[in-house]
């Protein structure tokens, strides 16, 4: 490797330098404090695990995004975490094994073999919260509200939210007896709003089911979509109607809590279809081509770890949150310059100052006083009448 290439980083892998790294860390603490104030407990998951554990309950998309290695000790295949959510689900289902509702949150770096989108980072700092043990819409409203509170804390402007429910399509597909390749083809066509393909794929179905599946292409827009869905899906199976009622209940409560929030409904939006089981949601802002925070309900994942538990949650990339947010993140500025000295009294004074939260930078041999400014110091320790005192740094 040429010397010049030794400093190159892989595509999508970034360094974070001062002071941006400090801003991200301050934001991380603020968001985790917010989560804690809502009753969410912080957990730390491993960076690397055996692959069968890491990908349990996850879809093919997560498999493709996971860096894989061989453990030299066991010879087993391992993966670097690409999504912390399944790890937290395992903690709830297998490790904690609580009976009642459990609220957990996390923040940590993940690695993606493939980026989510062009120009996306492959090393985001994933941050999120999960609520386990309750299947009601109240839990979905809680995690969505927490996600929006997080965005308000960061002062992210012009937030818009998309809402959908995979149970609507899943219930119709099951009632129609769709499975395998046909269901996947219909799923793909719905994501592209390819109405001609949807019509072709549903031609052999009973008229009422084909009509309702085709209606999913058009059922997207504002609150009026929910009223239209009640009419056009009136003859749908009970699970579909229950899913629609859940979505209506969630939308009503969000409108009360966040009356200024633009809501967009898309009943054909099947983001995370093979992973989620209920409501799905995502937040978008103008000028960004992908969601900046997203989540949904995924009640089945705990079964893969020995105990099925209702679950709902969301995640975001902390670096994106800091970049888009307008909130002022105050960083400590200034400091105290201390001379290079063996004086025990000076050392005691410095220890006291640091314990009080003061930033004290020691001069190294040969450094002139002018170096204090380069170290962002605005004061200095000087000895007066045998005592070390803090005084302003001469300009």
UniProtKB/Swiss-Prot annotation:
Main location: cytoplasm
Pathway: Amino-acid biosynthesis; L-histidine biosynthesis; L-histidine from 5-phospho-alpha-D-ribose 1-diphosphate: step 1/9
Gene Ontology cellular-component annotations: cytoplasm
Location within or outside the cell: Cytoplasm
Pfam family, one: tRNA-synt_His
Swiss-Prot/TrEMBL GO biological process terms: L-histidine biosynthetic process
Highest rank taxon of the organism: Bacteria
CDD domains: HisRS-like_core (cd00773)
Keyword set, alphabetical order: Amino-acid biosynthesis, Cytoplasm, Histidine biosynthesis
Family label: Belongs to the class-II aminoacyl-tRNA synthetase family. HisZ subfamily.
Function noted in UniProt: Required for the first step of histidine biosynthesis. May allow the feedback regulation of ATP phosphoribosyltransferase activity by histidine.
Quaternary structure (record): Heteromultimer composed of HisG and HisZ subunits.
Comment field (misc): This function is generally fulfilled by the C-terminal part of HisG, which is missing in some bacteria such as this one.
UniProt name for this protein: ATP phosphoribosyltransferase regulatory subunit
Source organism of the structure: Pseudomonas fluorescens (strain Pf0-1)
């Amino acid at each position: 490797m040429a010397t010049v290439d030794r400093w190159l980083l892989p595509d999508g892998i970034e360094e974070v330098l001062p002071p941006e790294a400090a801003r991200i860390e301050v934001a991380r603490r603020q968001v985790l404090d917010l989560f804690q104030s809502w009753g969410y407990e912080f957990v730390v998951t491993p960076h690397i695990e055996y692959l069968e554990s890491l990908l349990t309950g996850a879809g093919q998309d997560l498999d493709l995004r996971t860096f894989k290695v061989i453990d030299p000790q066991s010879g087993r295949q391992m993966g670097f975490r690409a999504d912390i959510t399944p790890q937290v689900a395992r903690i709830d289902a297998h490790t904690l094994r609580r009976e009642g509702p459990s609220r957990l949150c996390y923040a940590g770096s993940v690695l993606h073999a493939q980026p989510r989108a062009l120009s996306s980072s492959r090393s985001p700092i994933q941050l999120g919260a999960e609520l386990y043990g309750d299947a009601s819409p109240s839990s979905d409203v809680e995690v969505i509200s927490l996600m929006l509170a997080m965005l308000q804390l960061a002062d992210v402007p012009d937030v818009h939210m998309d809402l959908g429910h995979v149970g609507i399509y899943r219930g119709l597909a099951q009632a129609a007896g769709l499975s395998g390749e046909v269901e996947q083809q219909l799923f793909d066509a719905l994501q592209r709003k390819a109405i001609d393909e949807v019509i072709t794929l549903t031609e052999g179905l009973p008229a009422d089911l084909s009509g309702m599946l085709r209606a999913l292409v058009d059922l997207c827009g504002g609150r009026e979509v929910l009223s239209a869905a009640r009419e056009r899906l009136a003859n749908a199976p009970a699970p579909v109607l229950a899913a629609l009622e859940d979505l209506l209940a969630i939308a009503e409560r969000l409108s009360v809590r966040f009356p200024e929030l633009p809501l967009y409904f898309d009943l054909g939006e099947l983001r995370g279809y093979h992973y989620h089981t209920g409501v799905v949601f995502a937040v978008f802002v103008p000028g960004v081509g992908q969601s900046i925070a997203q989540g949904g309900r995924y009640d089945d994942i705990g079964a893969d770890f020995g105990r099925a538990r209702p679950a709902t949650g969301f995640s975001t990339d902390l670096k994106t949150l800091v970049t888009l947010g307008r909130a002022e993140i105050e960083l400590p500025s200034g400091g105290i310059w201390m001379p290079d000295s063996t004086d025990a009294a000076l050392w005691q004074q410095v220890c006291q100052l640091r314990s009080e939260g003061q930033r004290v930078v020691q001069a190294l041999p040969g450094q002139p006083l002018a170096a204090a400014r380069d170290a962002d110091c605005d004061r200095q320790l000087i000895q007066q009448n045998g005592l070390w005192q803090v005084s302003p740094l001469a300009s």
